[in-house]
């Protein structure tokens, strides 16, 4: 039994798991493993962008997954962060997060985009080192990540800001402050955690893909569970779907240890200089 436990632990090490997946698909390159708390999925996409722009690869496959365990659940319970009810991001009656499981994959290529392509325009990772589990109360790390990722992109060109929105007291309050500081308070905001919970390592990839599909469809998903504003800085949040004709969005994530990531995604025609 002891040998089986050791063998299983060895197989489940991140590097070994990544190599097995690459080997299964016949890819002989050494996988790059990105493990940075809850921003891992978005951090991996930003890493892919940098690898492509540096000319190291022509195509990068980014995949992320996470499953629940007694260790993970007990960890969140120790922070009193879990809700026994369905989570309610940014709502006045929110009581904590729900955990979920998922796996998601997205493929990036270095090429001249056609109008229907999605382009990762820019991404940034910033840290605030406020606390091992609590974010900066002024949203400093998230604010700096947003500003760095936005660059010259105008807020009014964004259809959506897909936020972390975990439904915890501190995260949602921090994000509302960061978004207002960055001038994004009038851009439609949603959190997808109410649909499938917090999928941790998969969240950044899964929520990016769903946001792409949402904007492609011209319908922004509502924030499930939201009813009444429960943060100090107002945001444009709706529990109901909304229509849009815009073709760009921002994705935000934050994680334990004070890590924050932001990225801007844009359709190829806008990226190539089309009308906004």
Language-model-detected regions and their locations in the chain:
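Acyl-CoA/ACP chain-elongation machinery
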Residues: 56-78, 83-87, 94, 123-137, ...
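Stable alpha-helical structural segments in soluble proteins, enriched in small hydrophobic residues
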Residues: 44, 145-153, 178, 182, ...
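Conserved catalytic cysteine-centered active-site region
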Residues: 8-47, 56, 72-74, 78-99, ...
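Flexible, low-complexity linker/loop segments at domain and module junctions
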Residues: 155, 233-276
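Condensing-enzyme catalytic core mediating Claisen C-C bond formation in acyl metabolism
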Residues: 82, 86-160, 269-275
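Short, small-residue-biased leader/transition segments that mark boundaries at the very start
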Residues: 1-5
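Short beta-strand-to-turn element immediately C-terminal to the catalytic PLP-Schiff-base lysine
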Residues: 106-111, 179-180, 238, 263-268
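Alpha-helical metal-binding/catalytic segments enriched in His/Glu/Asp
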Residues: 45-48, 103-111, 205-212
């Amino acid at each position: 039994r002891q040998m089986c436990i050791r063998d299983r632990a060895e197989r489940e090490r991140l590097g070994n798991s990544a190599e097995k997946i690459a080997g299964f698909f016949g890819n002989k390159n050494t996988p790059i493993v990105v493990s940075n708390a809850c921003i891992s999925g978005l951090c991996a996409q930003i890493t892919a962008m940098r690898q492509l722009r540096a000319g190291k690869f022509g195509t990068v496959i980014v995949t992320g997954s996470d499953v629940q365990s007694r260790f993970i659940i007990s960890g969140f319970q120790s922070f009193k962060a879990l809700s026994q009810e369905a989570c309610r991001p940014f709502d006045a009656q929110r009581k904590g997060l729900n955990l979920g499981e998922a796996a998601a994959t997205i493929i990036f290529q270095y090429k001249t985009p056609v109008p229907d392509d999605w382009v990762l325009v820019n991404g940034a990772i910033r840290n605030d080192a406020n606390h091992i589990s609590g974010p900066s109360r002024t949203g400093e790390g998230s604010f700096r990540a947003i500003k760095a990722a936005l660059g010259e992109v105008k807020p009014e060109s964004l259809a959506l800001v897909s936020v972390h929105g975990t439904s915890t007291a501190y995260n949602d309050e921090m994000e509302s402050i960061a978004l207002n500081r960055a001038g994004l308070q009038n851009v439609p905001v949603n959190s997808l955690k109410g649909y499938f919970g917090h999928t941790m390592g998969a969240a950044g990839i899964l929520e990016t893909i769903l946001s792409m599909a949402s904007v492609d469809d011209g319908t922004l998903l509502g924030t499930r569970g939201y009813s009444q504003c429960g943060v100090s800085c107002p945001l444009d949040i709706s529990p109901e779907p909304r229509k849009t004709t815009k073709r760009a969005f921002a994705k935000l994530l934050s994680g334990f240890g004070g890590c924050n990531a932001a990225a801007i995604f844009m359709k190829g025609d806008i990226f190539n200089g089309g009308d906004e």
